[in-house]
Amino acid sequence: MANASGSMSAVRETMDVLLEISRLLNTGLDMETLSICVRLCEQGINPEALSSVIKELRRASETLKASESTAS
């Protein structure tokens, strides 16, 4: 059981480091989103393709927000 505890601690520490790097790079990713991205990459998703999808979703979201604010 101590081994599982140590493993969870290592995972938590790794995610904390990745979150700090993410913040330094100003990615705008929160812990949950970053965790999802890491899991997708671990499952073989191309990180560059994932990055492109995230950027496109952000652009679409901003466009939608802008159109909603002008329609109001």
Swiss-Prot record:
The gene coding this protein: mzt1
InterPro entries: MZT1
Name this polypeptide is given: Mitotic-spindle organizing protein 1
Pfam families: MOZART1
GO BP of this protein: gamma-tubulin complex localization
Similarity comment: Belongs to the MOZART1 family.
Subcellular location: Cytoplasm, Cytoskeleton, Microtubule organizing center, Centrosome; Cytoplasm, Cytoskeleton, Spindle
Role, per record: Required for gamma-tubulin complex recruitment to the centrosome.
Native organism: Xenopus tropicalis (Western clawed frog)
GO terms under cellular component: centrosome; cytoplasm; gamma-tubulin ring complex; spindle
Subunit: Part of the gamma-tubulin complex.
Record key words, sorted: Cytoplasm, Cytoskeleton
Keyword Metal-binding: no
